[in-house]
């Protein structure tokens, strides 16, 4: 599942532009792919047998992960005028009029820092931003000749309006009394989930795509992160796994449920055993980033080894979000996983989510590389290692990134690549598969192999699905 802050990839023609702004720009330039470099109509492509990376959303998780927009505030007229001008100049060459000569735009995240400095460079950026965004202020301050405005960016009107980003503007009053933008920073908002998503809704989305089965990954670990933990943590983790088990049980031939735990909690093994025996969940989902795991900490590694051994003993396949909170996450972290943790589960499929990174986009190739190299070298520790690419392929990835993903797929072999779409209210399994087919330069045979991959833990059955798209 998406992290609380995510970065999007940018077209090759604009590598110097902050990715968060280009995600809003929706530039029309080709970004690569098998032909035109855009998502192909789903009606023309093969249909995956299964979606190996899906989530439901319980009422408890909605409350935990919802990101409500702050109340709107009324700005002084002079500051409001700056925002309205900023809206108006998007997509035009007139943007420079509202910026200072030394203006800069910065995007900061745990993993990247991109800067643009100078009025002309910022003006060029603004000229390529898709118009139509609305900046809704939710805070401001003025001190002498300096001011700041915090805003939420919306696209769409009425019921379809959606918050897509948060912007912070820093303003400076010039000698003639005019307020100009001296700096602005932005962060993409994850898709807003405001209502539960239940099994019936997921099955309908699978039917729309003609996908027969899905693996539902419990988000119970969300209640055990450092930011959400409380005295009732264990009870909430149990309740979430209970809820997931009850949901997937209503579609036993279509849905497979995986238990969710924080692997470094002292109750992790007991909860995993309960999930297998009492709830009949068929696998384990681990999210190292959400769970605060540090694979450079020997105590954390030992606990992960214990959890992997337990899953192997219970014959529970594992899906692991390998990226940790460490901002230096990369090759060293993957090698620790490969050498010290993975060998503890030699008899079950182990699925590395998001090509060893996060989503959206593909930004962790340094972590993916040693795993792909080990597979290509025939390392026996990787005998049951698989990879999903949930959220890695977006309509805005560069041609260079698309080629890199294709190279990694071929390096590990298409038989190890699993389709997954994650839970994104703004997308669907149907759309995600079409985007993957349209953006990544693989052959039809390679796409067919990925679509047909079926891991042994999926239940047998006669499937009643909607007809695959024609």
How would you label these PLM feature ranges?
Residues 122, 135-141, 152-154, 166-173:
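Hydrophobic/aromatic beta-strand elements that line small-molecule binding cavities or substrate pockets
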Residues 282-283, 296-418:
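Catalytic pocket-lining loop regions of alpha/beta-barrel enzymes
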Residues 15-26:
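Bacterial N-terminal signal peptides
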Residues 164-188:
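Short beta-strand edge/turn micro-motifs at domain boundaries
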């Amino acid at each position: 599942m998406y992290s609380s802050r995510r970065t999007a990839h940018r077209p090759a023609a604009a590598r110097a532009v902050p990715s968060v702004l280009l995600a809003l720009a929706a530039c029309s330039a080709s970004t690569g792919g098998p032909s035109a470099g855009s998502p192909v109509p789903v009606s023309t492509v093969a249909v995956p047998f299964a979606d190996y990376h899906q989530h439901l959303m319980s009422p408890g998780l909605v409350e935990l992960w919802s990101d409500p927009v702050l109340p709107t505030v009324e700005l002084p007229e002079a500051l409001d005028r700056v925002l309205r001008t900023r809206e108006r100049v998007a997509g035009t060459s007139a943007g420079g009029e509202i910026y200072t000569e030394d203006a800069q735009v910065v995007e900061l995240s745990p993993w990247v820092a991109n800067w643009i400095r100078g009025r002309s460079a910022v003006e060029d950026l603004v000229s390529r931003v898709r118009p139509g965004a609305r900046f809704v202020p939710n805070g401001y301050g003025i001190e002498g000749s300096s001011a700041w405005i915090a805003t939420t960016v919306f696209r769409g009107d009425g019921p379809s309006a959606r918050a897509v980003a948060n912007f912070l503007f820093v303003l400076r009053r010039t000698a003639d009394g005019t307020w100009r933008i001296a700096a602005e920073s932005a962060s993409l908002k994850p898709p807003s989930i405001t209502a539960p998503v239940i099994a019936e809704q997921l099955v309908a989305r699978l039917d729309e795509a003609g996908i027969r089965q899905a693996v539902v990954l419990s988000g119970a670990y969300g209640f055990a992160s450092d930011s959400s933990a409380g005295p009732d943590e264990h009870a909430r983790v149990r309740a979430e796994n209970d809820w997931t088990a009850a949901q997937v049980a209503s579609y036993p031939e279509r849905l497979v449920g995986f238990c969710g735990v924080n692997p470094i909690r002292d109750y992790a093994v007991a909860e995993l055993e309960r999930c297998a025996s009492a709830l009949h969940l068929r696998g384990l989902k681990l999210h190292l980033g959400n769970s605060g795991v540090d694979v450079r900490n020997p105590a954390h590694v030992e606990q992960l080894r214990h959890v992997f051994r337990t899953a192997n003993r219970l014959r529970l396949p594992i899906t692991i979000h390998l990226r940790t909170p460490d901002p230096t996450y990369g090759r060293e972290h993957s090698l620790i996983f490969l050498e010290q943790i993975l060998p503890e589960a030699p008899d079950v499929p182990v699925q590395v989510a998001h090509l060893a990174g996060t989503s959206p986009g593909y930004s962790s190739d340094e972590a993916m590389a040693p795993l792909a190299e080990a597979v290509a070298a025939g390392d026996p520790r990787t005998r049951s290692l698989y990879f999903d690419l949930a959220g890695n392929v977006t309509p805005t990835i560069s041609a260079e990134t698309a080629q890199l993903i294709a190279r990694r797929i071929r390096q590990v072999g298409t038989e190890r690549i699993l389709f997954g779409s994650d839970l994104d209210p703004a997308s669907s399994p149907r759309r995600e598969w079409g985007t993957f087919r349209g953006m990544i330069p693989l052959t039809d045979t390679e796409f067919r192999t990925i679509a047909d991959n079926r891991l042994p833990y999926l239940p047998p059955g006669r499937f009643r699905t909607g007809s695959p798209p024609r």
